[in-house]
């Protein structure tokens, strides 16, 4: 079923890059795979991901999720299925986003201005203070899993970047006093290079209204999906 799922997902490659990477990395529990409609659960995060070219097969997959009864986070590829998921599963739209992915044959050249390394756990509080989506305990968990990196000038933390549980590049932040120097490029190019050399396709999820970040992705050579996706969560 994995080969079949990849075949169908790759028919709209950029739209489905998070799903196809979950399959490629061995982190996908595939619940259904048909041409134009694939449903999986990403094992590391527990996030369900639903691709449907048309509404009707997507609605059928939402009903399958209703039967499972354990959905806390869900990504869908259609606005009408987003609305149906809110109604049927009791989820709420968290954000709308574009997938971006690095599809080039070699990674971008690193600027080499920062020393990028795993930060000490003593910096977890500082990182949590500058990134609203993780608390201090969650930051420590990311550090221990090797999924969070800091950029340093000497012993000063300039910014940080990491990997979300479902495998996307994110958690990117440059501390206020170091902004407007291009350090975000340095940090993300490091993560792209890291994933590239691990045999992964580097990808990220960017809010549709975050033009600053979308511009950064273009500078890095990332390809952007034409169609947006929708992330829902239980609140």
Language-model features, listed with the residues they occupy:
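N-terminal charged segments
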Residues: 1-73, 78-83, 128-133, 139-141
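Conserved N-terminal entry element of GNAT/NAT acetyltransferase domains
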Residues: 1-3, 89-120
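Glycine-rich acetyl-CoA-binding "A-motif" of GNAT/NAT acetyltransferases
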Residues: 35-36, 156-159, 212
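A conserved beta-strand-loop-helix scaffold within acyl/acetyltransferase catalytic domains
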Residues: 42, 137-177
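Conserved acetyl-CoA-binding loop-helix of GNAT-fold acetyltransferases
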Residues: 56-65, 180-195, 211-219
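Conserved active-site alpha-helix within GNAT-family acetyltransferase domains
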Residues: 80-91, 185, 208-226
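Conserved catalytic-core motifs of GNAT/GCN5-like acyltransferases
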Residues: 90-105, 205, 221-235
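Conserved hydrophobic beta-strand within the GNAT/NAT acetyltransferase core sheet
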Residues: 169, 202-206
């Amino acid at each position: 079923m994995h080969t079949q799922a990849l075949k169908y997902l790759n028919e709209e490659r950029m739209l489905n890059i998070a799903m196809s990477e979950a399959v490629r990395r061995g982190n996908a529990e595939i619940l259904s795979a048909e041409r134009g409609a694939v449903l999986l659960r990403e094992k590391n995060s527990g996030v369900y991901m639903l691709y449907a070219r048309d509404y009707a097969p997507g609605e059928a997959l939402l009903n399958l999720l209703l039967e499972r009864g354990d959905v806390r986070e869900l990504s869908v590829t259609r606005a009408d299925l987003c609305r149906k998921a809110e109604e049927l599963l009791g989820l709420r739209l968290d954000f709308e986003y574009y997938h971006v992915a690095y599809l080039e044959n070699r990674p971008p050249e690193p600027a080499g201005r920062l020393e990028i390394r795993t930060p000490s756990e003593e910096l977890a509080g500082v990182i949590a203070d500058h990134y609203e989506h993780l608390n201090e305990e969650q930051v420590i968990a990311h550090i221990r899993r090797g999924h969070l990196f800091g950029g340093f000038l000497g012993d000063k933390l300039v910014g940080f970047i990491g990997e979300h549980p479902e495998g996307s590049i994110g958690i990117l932040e440059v501390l206020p006093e170091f902004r407007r120097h291009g350090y975000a490029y340095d940090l993300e190019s490091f993560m792209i290079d890291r994933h590239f050399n691990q045999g992964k396709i580097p990808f990220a999820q960017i809010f549709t209204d975050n033009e600053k970040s979308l511009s950064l992705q273009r500078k890095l050579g990332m390809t952007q999906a034409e169609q947006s996706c929708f992330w829902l969560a239980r609140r």
